[in-house]
C-alpha cells in the first residue's frame, strides 16, 4: 500500500552544509533563522487580527510545519539575504 504523505521537513532537511553557504558561521545562521522564524510566527498570530505587519512564508508550507523549519527552507532556497551590520567607528 503506497502513501501520498511525504516525509516531514525538519531540522535535518535542508542539510546544514547547504545552509552554511548562506552565512559566515553557524552562529550567524542560528540568529538569522531565529529572527525569520519569529517574523513567521508573528505573521500567523496577526492573521486572525487582520494585521499584516510581517511578511508571511515565502515557500509552500504544511499545516503542522514549524516556523523554524520554514525559515531554514527559505534560507536554503536563497529567498532571503543576510547582510552584516558594521558597528560604530571607534
Swiss-Prot record:
GO molecular function, one term: DNA binding
Catalysed transformations (reactions): RNA(n) + a ribonucleoside 5'-triphosphate = RNA(n+1) + diphosphate
Positions of transmembrane segments: none
Broad EC category: transferase
Keyword field: DNA-directed RNA polymerase, Nucleotidyltransferase, Transcription, Transferase
InterPro entries named in the record: DNA-dir_RNA_pol_omega, Pol_omega/Rpo6/RPB6, RPB6/omega-like_sf
GO terms classed as biological process: DNA-templated transcription
Coiled-coil segments: none
Enzyme Commission code(s) on record: 2.7.7.6
Domain of life the protein comes from: Bacteria
One GO CC term, this protein: DNA-directed RNA polymerase complex
Protein's UniProt keywords contain Nucleotide-binding: no
Homology family: Belongs to the RNA polymerase subunit omega family.
Assembly: The RNAP catalytic core consists of 2 alpha, 1 beta, 1 beta' and 1 omega subunit. When a sigma factor is associated with the core the holoenzyme is formed, which can initiate transcription.
Function: Promotes RNA polymerase assembly. Latches the N- and C-terminal regions of the beta' subunit thereby facilitating its interaction with the beta and alpha subunits. Required for kasugamycin production and aerial mycelium formation in S.kasugaensis and responsible for pleiotropy.
NCBIfam families: rpoZ (TIGR00690)
Name of the protein in its database record: DNA-directed RNA polymerase subunit omega
Originating species: Streptomyces kasugaensis
Source lineage: Bacteria, Bacillati, Actinomycetota, Actinomycetes, Kitasatosporales
Name of the gene this protein is made from: rpoZ
Amino acid at each position: 500500500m503506497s502513501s501520498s504523505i511525504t516525509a516531514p521537513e525538519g531540522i535535518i532537511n535542508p542539510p546544514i552544509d547547504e545552509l552554511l553557504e548562506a552565512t559566515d558561521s553557524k552562529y550567524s545562521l542560528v540568529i538569522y533563522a531565529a529572527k525569520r522564524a519569529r517574523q513567521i510566527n508573528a505573521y500567523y498570530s496577526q492573521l486572525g487580527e487582520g494585521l499584516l505587519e510581517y511578511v508571511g512564508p515565502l515557500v509552500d508550507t504544511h499545516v503542522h510545519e514549524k516556523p523554524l523549519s520554514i525559515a531554514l527552507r527559505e534560507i536554503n532556497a536563497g529567498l532571503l539575504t543576510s547582510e552584516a551590520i558594521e558597528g560604530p567607528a571607534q
